Amino acid sequence: ELAEAQPLLLDVREVHEWEAGHIQGAVHVPLGKLDEGLADLDPAREIVVYCAGGARSIDGSYVLKRAGFGNVRSLAGGLAAWQGAGNETIIS
C-alpha cells in the first residue's frame, strides 16, 4: 500500500548510464524504447521521469502524456541534481 503511494521513478537513460548508478527503486526504460515499454507501466500511478540532466526526462514525460498517462512529472536537473542534493544512488 505504501509502495503504491510513492511515485514510480522512471529512469530513461541509456543502459550504461543505469549500470553506473541509479535511484534505488527506480524502473529503467531507455527513452528510445519507452513506446514499447508503456504496457509495463500503470497509467493511474504518479510517475516521475528522470535522466542525467533533465532534457531526456522532459521528452519521456511527453511520450507518457501523449499515451494517456495523467500524473507525470520530470525530475528537474535529473540525476545530477538528485546527487547534488545529497541523495544516494545504487549500482545493481
What are these regions (language model features)?
Residues 1-8, 12-92:
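Rhodanese-like catalytic fold shared by cysteine-dependent sulfurtransferases
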